[in-house]
Amino acid sequence: QSAIIFVQQLGRGLRKLQGKDFLTVIDFIGNYQNNFLIPVALFGDNSYNKDNLRKIVSGGSQGIFGNSTVDFDRISKDQIYKAINETSFSQLKFLYEQYQNMQAKLGRTPKLMDFEAMDAISPLRFCPPTNQVKSYLEFRCKKEKTEPSELGITEKHLQSLRFFTQLLPRGLRPQELYLIKACINGNHSLDSIKSEAQKNSNCILDMRSWSSAISILQNGFLKVAEKAAFGNISYVKLGNNGLSPTDDFKALLENQCYKSELEDILSVGLAEYKKQFLRSKGKTQAGNLVVNSKYSRKDACRLLNWKNNEESTIYGYKMDYDTNTCPIFITYDKDTENISGSTNYQDRFINEETFEWFSRNKRTTSSEELQGLINQATSKTRTPLFVKKSDGEGTDFYYLGDLNTISAENSKIEDKGKQLDIVKFNFHMSTPIDENLLNYLDTKPTGNIQSDIVNPA
């Protein structure tokens, strides 16, 4: 039930015999339901980031300092992975415990940045806490049994904080972060904003990406329902004097509680972006897409500078003619019992540098939507590849780099006895896939237990 108690009880009462070099402790895991706490206990990772926990278990002794070692047998590993996959670290009860622990340490109400600074649970677990509690302020009010209105917070303030909670904390790219920072601090020079952001970026921040960020902050990009949920607020405007906050944004910032909450969210986003910047040198592609990092379809639309959020219509792939990009999304282990033969595509890695992929059915090499890929040498269509092993991993995909077309040929796929047209592509991967990740993707799970999971560093 507790990572601390697990460590206290591990090998309790045992001592190294005089003259022996080491002591071996064999622990039989009985409580499978909570064994996601084992990597937290043994390796001291309190972030509760699922990818971090999987990586730690896979790496074994690599994550332990000093002369100690740790080994898990295969069944134990599988059960720990299964618990990590199935456990929600966004349940209010769990988050309340983490909040109370931090509150006790600090002797005051913790900010999001306190979790970042104290090497505790990742503040991203609170961004948002749950689908029902959509900002950290609302989480605290619910925990402390107070109402936001007691702090002068209106529904408009809450809608705005929910918007920024979704947009900023993960630090996916710097543009929105530096634009909002400038508005709060009274910096109106767009050139100086761009210069500061570029100094802290591993890729070129081009005009299209700045236009995309400004559009998002001017109530663009999002779907109509999303805009309404977030209050239909435009935050920035451009004029002869450069960048400035809109009147609506100025009015929101007059409330000190709102301003403090926004600054806290912004600080987390800048800190997360800085961490990404430091660890991703040499792995960052255009749009701040980092090889082996994970993104949702919505993230991809944003980072590829699409005008609108097209996440619900991408499915396996989609050509955006405005940006000349065609991201491909692959679920490697498909649920064959619940999909038709016409969508059971046999996409696969032939080796670390070659990927075989199939278009939608009822397509040929003459289909308009495929011309950018078929004639990529002249079209210059960018084709980022996103892969996840199974639907059990959630909605995020590993970005594995961009694809370059080697060949495209007409083929067939069978569905209920019918032969349907399809196009088979072979792509060269601009970044060879990590060998451990490739082995993981190619390993078929046994029963309901997932196999070894490796998230490359």
Language-model features, listed with the residues they occupy:
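A short, structural micro-pattern
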Residues: G19-F22, S379, F397, Q419-D421
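Conserved segment of the helicase C-terminal RecA-like domain
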Residues: S2-F43
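Long, largely alpha-helical accessory region at the distal end of helicase-like NTP-driven motors
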Residues: I38-Y178, V454-A457
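Acidic, glycine-rich low-complexity segments with interspersed aromatic residues
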Residues: S160, A182, G287-D396
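Compact mixed alphabeta submodule
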Residues: S390-P456
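Short, surface-exposed beta-strand/loop "edge" segments at domain boundaries and coil↔beta transitions
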Residues: K105-R108, N185-K194, D333-N344, G392-T395, ...
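C-terminal accessory/interaction regions of large nucleic acid-associated machines
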Residues: S149-E311, Y321-C326, N344-Y345, F349-N351
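Structured loops at beta-to-helix junctions and adjacent beta-edge loops in soluble globular domains
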Residues: F28-N31, T331-D333, K388, H428-S430
